[in-house]
Amino acid sequence: KITRLNVDKAKAIKGVHTVYLFKEVAGTTVKEVDGKEVVDDTNATCNYDGELVAAVAAETADIAEDGVRAIEVAYDVLPHVVDETDLEGGRAAKRMKYDRDSGEEVPIVDRTVGDPDKAIKEADVVHTGHYGIHTISHMCLEPHGAHCTWDESGDGPTLTARHSTQAVSTTGAQFAGHFGLDAGDVRVICNYIGGGFGSKFAADIWGWAAAQMSKDTGRPVRLMLDRATELKTPGTRPSGFANVTVAATKDGKVTAWKSEHWGTDGPKGGTIDGNQMPYVFDPPNKHVISRGISTDCGPNRAWRAPN
């Protein structure tokens, strides 16, 4: 939780034009709940390492970095869970999915076909094993980001966003909605993209930030995530771990499959899709159960599209 956030020194640096805040100090926002005013620290809480707090627009990248270093920020560390492999740790921390009424843990998928226990007992060969793969970043060669400019010369403001995106046709509406523009007043350009793989379908908060800083300064603003932030913030592929039992006949015919899966897709508490397991094979007897751990790590995004 952010307890202090001071950008005055950053703004005072020669060559710095503006500072954009993604977050605020705890206690800043108050909302009414059941007729009472309560503090809402949602936007004062960083949910994972790498979540954006502030951005600086300056004459050069070096000056912008000086501005970022001049920002004073302090945090209170909150309880957190980051070990995606530790199913029992996730349970102990109450980071699984639970039924609202009973409080019982609820699997994401719990599917049985046939009688896998009987098939395993009668099989000629039984193999058990533990398998898994950790969360993986998309590793886009070109990081996420945008270059934004405004034109105030016409009847109303228009925005041009040169955006690293797989979705030129839809991100314009996201910029328009955020800034209260007509869709026709936003132009999105992406002549090439240095990798997206399913992770570049949104205007994103950094795109909005670039556009807002451009609007505030009356100058073009280019905001691209640095490599460290690129690996943490704009989405990853969920992790998946599994204890698997496979049964077969002597001639190699698979007769049964049992698997218990878990992993994380970040704060939402999902994992890989258990409904797709076992992939390719379709044994006549199977039981698949999957659970997700809600972790204080970056969120997931689609993993696909060889571009």
Q: Where do the protein language model's features map onto the residues?
A:
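Glycine-rich and small/hydrophobic secondary-structure elements
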Residues: 35-67, 197-250, 300-307
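Short helix/loop capping segments that flank catalytic or ligand/cofactor-binding pockets
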Residues: 2-3, 29-30, 64-67, 137, ...
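Flexible, low-hydrophobicity surface segments
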Residues: 1-105, 126, 206
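Alpha-helical support elements that line or immediately flank enzyme active sites
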Residues: 1-22, 54-75, 145-217, 263, ...
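Short, glycine-/Ser/Thr-/acidic-enriched flexible segments
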Residues: 24-26, 53, 61-63, 132-134, ...
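Glycine-rich loop/linker segments at domain edges
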Residues: 103-146, 239-307
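Hydrophobic residues embedded in beta-strands of well-ordered beta-sheets
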Residues: 92, 157-159, 254
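General beta-strand structural signal in soluble alpha/beta enzymes
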Residues: 18-22, 48, 127-131, 161-163, ...
